[in-house]
Amino acid sequence: MFSNNLCEITILSFGNNWLQKRVSADSVMRKPDFRRFWFSSILAHFGAQITLLALPICAVLMLHATPAQMGTLAAFESLPFLLFGLPSGVLLDRSRRLPVIMCSDLMVAIALASVPLAWWLDMLTIPWLYAVGFVIGAGHVVGGSAEQVFLTFLVGRDGLVDAQAKFAATESAARVVGPGMAGGLVQLLGAPIAILCNVAGFIISLLNLRRIRAREPQPPPSTSHPMRDIQEGLAFVWNQPLLRTLAWVSACWHLLFYGYTALHVLFATRVLGMTPGTMGMANMLGGLGVLAASLLVKPLSRRLGTGGGILVGLCVSAFGFALVPAIPTALFGSATWTVAAYAIVVFWIDCGATLFFVPYIALRQRVTPDAVLGRMVATMRALTVAAAPLGALLAGGLGEGFGVRAGLGCIAAGAVLLAAGGVFGTRLKEAKE
């Protein structure tokens, strides 16, 4: 779930005829159902910015979580990918995807709504947040895989790169505007109440998804045992050298990213002294990295091939990870310069992640037949995010034992090694399609 079309929307006053000409020239945007699906993605990305800030802020500032507890929270959020990733692929290949997406979104909305309720009842605890994080992760496992497969159904394989670029533009807009909005809401209302805004977004999104008219054909009933289907998904990925390479590279990236996720709020608040408001502002500026990447991803894929674009993303994100532990507490003796440095770091990490994942998703779906597409997506998600709980727990342990900055330093070293391994140890640069 990641474009100039967002810019078009903001300048409608220049003439509806001009916009209609642009839309008519865009085969993806001519599809009303894609536009509805994209709108729900916009709501999801903006709402996610609130939760990404508010949930860890609840843990760090309200419940005084330790680095180990933050690592455990991040691990619980990613654990469902390991537990449910493979079975979800069987479910997707046996079910229509849109109802699965809607059920997953409803489950996440209920979990999020429990946070302000528990806070109001004075029952909010770290274990409660563990449970909420686990439910949110479970919803994302099934719903996220279903969204990728349903998008392929809506636009076809030929429209995937263009559609993914538009989703990247959505994320870029959310990453530029959303964090500032989220930081302001958390600062003004408190983290639990701010989460309610995301719940409202889920409700609107569900109502919008009900308006999608395209109906997937019901997959033929399967007489095989679910375990056999899981084995077929694993075998398909394993027997495709390209998918196998993508799986281990993405698994290593997720291990590092979830380690960073476990520690970055602690680092920003307790080491750098940032408030939720300044964190939101820094992340808002850093979100320009996603915007830059969404504009670069198609030219890079044309020039370097899809695999080359993936490698560029690895290197750019590694550069961002390497900068994190180098941020001083008071750069040039000023907290303002420290916030600016933090924003620059987020810029590079987000830019690299987008440059990596847009061609990564498009490439793996191009080489997969429809019959196993759901199992492939779920298998890849399960394999690649399986390392995430380990990364979060390791980072939390390193932060607890040696300090948050030292833990982030280990993540930086791992990111540099991964980028070098991707460039010199794989044949991704040869993947042109």
Residue ranges of predicted features:
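Alpha-helical transmembrane-bundle signature of multi-pass membrane transport and export proteins
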Residues: 2-433
